[in-house]
Amino acid sequence: MNAVAEMPSPIVFSDSAAMKVAELIEEEGNPDLKLRVFVQGGGCSGFQYGFTFDEIVNEDDTTMTKNGVQLLIDSMSYQYLVGAEIDYKDDLEGAQFVIKNPNATTTCGCGSSFSA
């Protein structure tokens, strides 16, 4: 039996992020898409965030649903994202997804890489 971890998450998936993801999924025309957020080695601070669409929920994924949008985080990335907020900003600096991560001890100027 394949069991996908679905538990209350200390990760915040903001309304604005969920609304933007829903808009992007609608543009793609594939209602099976889910937003996958991950952490990988790289960037100027050691780790960097990644965002992609995925149709598949893996066994070790933690899932969250907000406003009908499903967010997926693999178990390795989850440990770095506990307590973080995944948000979408549209301001003078531009429109982008941002992660506010209290686990990041340092971040680079662009905010896309960090060390923990």
Curated annotation (Swiss-Prot):
- Keyword vocabulary terms for this entry: Iron, Iron-sulfur, Metal-binding
Q: Which GO terms describe its molecular function?
A: 2 iron, 2 sulfur cluster binding; 4 iron, 4 sulfur cluster binding; iron ion binding
Which InterPro entries is this protein grouped with?
Answer: FeS_biogenesis (IPR000361), FeS_cluster_insertion (IPR016092), FeS_cluster_insertion_CS (IPR017870), FeS_cluster_insertion_RrpA (IPR023063), HesB-like_dom_sf (IPR035903)
Q: Where does iron-sulfur cluster bind?
A: 44, 108, 110
Fetch the PROSITE patterns from UniProt. HESB
Q: Which Pfam families match?
A: Fe-S_biosyn
Q: Which GO terms describe its biological process?
A: iron-sulfur cluster assembly
Q: Which HAMAP family match?
A: Fe_S_insert_ErpA (MF_01380)
User: Per its UniProt record, what PANTHER family does this chain match?
Assistant: IRON-SULFUR CLUSTER ASSEMBLY 2 HOMOLOG, MITOCHONDRIAL
The molecule here is called Putative iron-sulfur cluster insertion protein ErpA
